[in-house]
Amino acid sequence: MESYLEENFGGVKAKNSSEEALRRWRKLCGVVKNPKRRFRFTANLDKRGEAQAIKHANHEKLRVAVLVSKAALQFIQGLSLRSEYVVPEEVKAAGFQICADELGSIVEGHDSKKLITHGGVTGIADKLATSPADGLSTAEESIKRRQDVYGLNKFTESEVRSFWVFVWEALQDTTLIILAVCAFVSLVVGIAMEGWPKGAHDGLGIVASILLVVFVTATSDYRQSLQFKDLDKEKKKIQVQVTRNGFRQRLSIYDLLPGDVVHLAIGDQVPADGLFISGFSLLINESSLTGESEPVVVNEDNPFLLSGTKVQDGSCKMLITTVGMRTQWGKLMATLSEGGDDETPLQVKLNGVATIIGKIGLFFAVITFIVLSQGLISKKYHEGLLLSWSGDDALEMLEHFAIAVTIVVVAVPEGLPLAVTLSLAFAMKKMMNDKALVRHLAACETMGSATTICSDKTGTLTTNHMTVVKACICGNIKEVNNPKNASDLCSELPETVVKTLLESIFNNTGGEVVIDQDGKYQILGTPTETALLEFALSLGGNFKAKRDETKIVKMEPFNSTKKRMCVVLKLPGGGCRAHCKGASEIVLAACDKFMDETGAVVPLDKTTADKLNGIIESFANEALRTLCLGYREMEEGFSVEEQIPLQGYTCIGIVGIKDPVRPGVRESVATCRSAGIMVRMVTGDNINTAKAIARECGILTEDGLAIEGPEFREKSLDELLKLIPKIQVMARSSPLDKHTLVKHLRTTFNEVVAVTGDGTNDAPALHEADIGLAMGIAGTEVAKESADVIILDDNFSTIVTVAKWGRSVYVNIQKFVQFQLTVNVVALLVNFSSACFTGNAPLTAVQLLWVNMIMDTLGALALATEPPNDDLMKREPVGRTGKFITNVMWRNILGQSFYQFIVMWYLQTQGKSMFGLDGPDAEVVLNTIIFNSFVFCQVFNEISSREMEKINVLRGILKNYVFLGVLTSTVVFQFIMVQFLGEFANTIPLTRLQWIASVLLGLIGMPISAIIKLLPVGSS
């Protein structure tokens, strides 16, 4: 079966499946009782096609708009323009001078002509009653007016479907519709023959069973849909930096309004349409909106920023002009919200299993109907009444047909793929509480098979709370882990050195020091920037004063490829100065001079360079991150178009930044090792820092290898194949190195790879990995969008929790499959064999519907929601080539099925003598005992299925309230059904002895199951 499934249903991958593969597997699902329900959570490929068409149209629209705008600009250069725009009265009344439609046409149409007629960006800001420096006012009445005129930054989403929609969908099950028709005919014929109410019992019994199945199914599906809706809302929560009332603050993108001033950096998503106010080296990736991969330069000449696009490089301040559904992104999102998620590989395989068993069930159902009908016809023939049919005969034939249809209901295990959805929804909800947000269903499933985790160091293995603890300035090494030490260092250094150092830190930064509403200093920026700015403040520096002294001419922000950040300043006395900071070895290699202890600039000879490199190494050996700062004097005529020089710098000093290892990381790494998961550290830091941290975390072992990115890049393919299995630490790595490592691990070594990432440049590796894990705090929006799971607390221990939940989902579904296939096999065999050999079926349509509900919805609820236990992390991972339906499962299924079938067959043939049954009700009593015993066999088999290999199946059962609730409700309802609903369920109240016997026959299944588990099975 496994090879058939792989061949026919294995084309769908956990990530990046082709559309052809997604369409193909659905066509292969031959027997589907309710397509609407079965395929509810699968991707809507038609909607995706619509989204692609919108992207293509956007691309064409933007291309035309830019061409028209350029042509118009050629005509209006130098002309004095007067706006002919008329402000609508309601906009004027609200205190604004421009309407939403006009703003939309300017930005979306890239209309430079209109922008100039409105006075450029500052003119638009005035008309929006806002300030490019201080942002808009937060007065409640002002915000309300703005919302009324321009709308909210929210997109139209598909409405939450009501409970009754799910009821209607559950009713569209083909087999239930056929049974409903049978019930209707049964009611009509029964009432005509026996009158009301006696003649209605059989028909009403089927109707009641159908309604019960429908309502339980609809309730389960409705709860799942609400869970997915909640998770979808979590995915869309994005915070941005905004200036309002002159103060910087973080705000949800849903609270943004036209007139807001937003600050963007590398990796951010543009939250709404708007205009560029100021910034440096801004490159925008518009592929999410237009499909065009070439980045666009945005500056004063091309100031248009479109919602949904991403900052690829640089930083800027933007003015929001258009929000929500008025933007192209809003329209695209409304379409994509109906696109759905791809079906996971496990769901697809289980659809295959359901199809195979469904076809077998259909075959047996037809044979059963033929055999039962043949028995009736044969009886009529022998009685000479073949042409004389009564209402009773019609009802009997109808009952045979209903039994055949119900065999299909039981035999087609549609609960299998739906159990995956139920289990994943349950796990995703619980993982949210454990600080992990699953973006793609398949990731939760794939994480259970992970064999390797490639983890970042900073913020994942470490706390990301950084402080400068050591500094080497002018050759003077000093501990600066408290304000007094920093003050002492400042007094020991020449004034010119302190001035240059503060100028470097305060200007060459992506961070900012602001005063909050309480009048206190607040440092904004990455943890590294924050540590440096805190250090500069402790030296007595004033951020605003230093920034006001000079003017920034050009800035090149830090990224993980260049590993440095540079800025060119225009000095107050004339001339320019470039400042550079970054990875110590790289910046020091760019220096040919240094500042000595007197503050004099002297040539950097080999001896001094070696000494400084030794200091870098000693800092790194103490697990400190090191940064080197340098500057270079330049000519006054430096132009923005010129490249900032890469050489000729003067070394100011080196700082050592402490980033402590997170508590619990060492234990989590040990847990991974015992679970057969190899943890590798991939970092941009110095190799000595990386090795020190890796040893502290327990990642780097005696036989492990630590390698630098540049060395890794130079290796030949043959050398890489020998090295990669041993690599535990990769330092000074570029995003491309990470991508190469992941690709080789996946393709050459067949590993299932999880990768963490936080930066924009990590997106390719996150995309390539089987499971991409983005950091929720330090991660950029680009990284989060490329990821499958977002680690909300940036903690490595959470990644281990995700792996544990992934394994739990996988094992829970295996348990459910084992349980359901057992019920399938036994129900099929009992009714088929009985029909063939005795001419009647002991399990009626109503009873089989009840069994189907125990098996499908309640069984899935009980077994697929079992929480994870620590034992899951003591077994080897399934890996890429592991079989889903294992030999252990086949052993348990066949063993338990054999026991149950023997019990049912014995009751069928010897039950009357065993219980001393005679008289007119003997047949009904026996069939009730068979039904009751069959249900209790499933109840105890459900308990046995909690463990596939272990004997102790009761461990932790009292903590699983869902499981206990399902078992209790099953037993209670079974009692009511047998004792009180006999007219509807074709049962008769049983004696105490008969109840004890039924329960005991089910209970014996547990020790039988334990004995079966002792039987050894091979791996093939």
From Swiss-Prot:
Chain ranges on the Cytoplasmic side, renumbered to this chain: 1-175, 220-263, 373-400, 864-887, 945-961, 1016-1020
Purpose of the protein: This magnesium-dependent enzyme catalyzes the hydrolysis of ATP coupled with the translocation of calcium from the cytosol out of the cell, into the endoplasmic reticulum, or into organelles.
Enzyme class: translocase
Primary gene name: ACA10
Domain remark from Swiss-Prot or TrEMBL: The N-terminus contains an autoinhibitory calmodulin-binding domain, which binds calmodulin in a calcium-dependent fashion.
Location of region: Interaction with calmodulin: 21-32
Domain of life: Eukaryota
UniProt KW Transmembrane helix keyword: yes
Name assigned to this protein: Calcium-transporting ATPase 10, plasma membrane-type
SMART domains documented for this protein: Cation_ATPase_N
A single Gene Ontology CC term: plasma membrane
Pfam family of the protein (one): E1-E2_ATPase
